[in-house]
């Protein structure tokens, strides 16, 4: 895409790493990619600046505490250490009162499902998202499993919040002949992760009340390429995700198409829930478009060389003004299973 740099935010605010405070930057100010080094490291001069990171901040780096500060401190050596709380402006007085809490870290997480109480159209899909609230430095992957989906419906599962990320999105689908009185009371959503060497399982809220609505104006289909054309699977056969395999460092062709049911307008689409390092290649700021009165268009996935082997459910979603891949409340396609696999024909050296 045209954007040269993408920023990951925390609830719409800039996230600061290394317990630093968010600051404003002037136009054309240099930006550096940094690598943390422990105290006492011998740094080879290379012409680039060296930054000393002190244990100090004004606002918590994850932006969860408003104007309050938070530091994560690991003593580099045995000794006595002092904590100092001051006004950042250097002001002081008898009414400048602060509260200081010192405690051990308790890494944990919670997950919230958004896009609840959806209205689904027969044969179509609606997006939902799962947002992770990470605590006290836990940055590992989180797996979400959805079970108990009634017959005639499908939900993306399992889903994975990747290490260091806070969002994954899925697609909830209704068959063309889905029943309006389906029993959703048995649906369970669980999140599992390894925290501190122990497996932790948390329950997650479910979809709530799912309503079967009227026929959609169009249905979006995401499919692999088959001999230069889309697979063209029948809508009634969308029971299990089709598979698409990509090799790190390469591109692979896929197709977006629409079954129009009275709507011939331009359709703007994005691809959501791709693995970190996999993008839709060679597109502009408008994303992927199916033009007015047209029904299909090809596009290409590209995977960076460093992407690890994995399986991930992804889907197309009608474009929104959001800055992230949150599918909540958006019309989506039935998901496909994107498989990232190393090229086994390459001889190791």
Regions found by a protein language model. Give the residues of each.
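Short, solvent-exposed loop/linker segments at beta-strand-coil boundaries, enriched for Pro/Gly
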Residues: 147-157, 273-286
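Short strand-edge motifs at loop-to-beta-strand transitions and within beta-strands
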Residues: 69-71, 126-128, 166-170, 252, ...
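Short acidic, flexible loop segments centered on an aromatic residue
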Residues: 135-150, 263-276
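Short, surface-exposed loop/turn segments at beta-strand-coil junctions that are enriched for proline
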Residues: 74-78, 88-90, 162-164, 173-181, ...
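C-terminal edge strands of extracellular/lumenal beta-sandwich accessory domains
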Residues: 1-137, 143-145, 177-179, 188-204, ...
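Short beta-strand segments of immunoglobulin-like
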Residues: 114-120, 240-246, 286-288
